[in-house]
Amino acid sequence: ILHEQAEFRVTGMTPQDFVNKIVQSIPGLANDHRLFVSLRDQLPLLAEAAPGPFLDALEQLLKGNGEMIAPIFNEDKGLLTPRSHYHGLKWALEALAWEQTYLLRAAICLAKLAVIDPGGTYSDRPLNSLRTIFLAWSPNTWAPVKVRNAIIKKLSLLFLVLGGVCYKISFLAPMIPLIKTKK
């Protein structure tokens, strides 16, 4: 709608398709964690501009045991406190989780990041993002209760299948009875 008011036209495609194509063409986005590190402060903007291609690239990096993206959790020595590089990615996923359309994919990415997260100095971790997104009394998503419940169940099943990692996201299971739907 805004592109119409700004009289922004792209021949042969919508402006969203144009932006998606640009993000898809970023070299290394789907196979080099260093790009995510270098773009850390811009990742929320990139994710909001082209959610599909952003999630596609991240899901590619998270394939297998996540070794391709695990280095973003490394902490560098800072002047006073250590510096970590995962915050921009986490904030991008939190922003996408507000939209029901992207909630499942964002939640799965956060859960996979939580599984490979070795912990560290900061308490603001991917697991805490999942908690705040699905918080029963104040969820950080616009998705209705039924959708949130279904996603929590899918996450529980998905990570049960992966085996040995379910304990990290086991906090989700008790939330299901707390989130009651209206009859």
Where are the language model's segments positioned?
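Non-catalytic all-alpha helical scaffold/repeat segments
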Residues: I1-K183
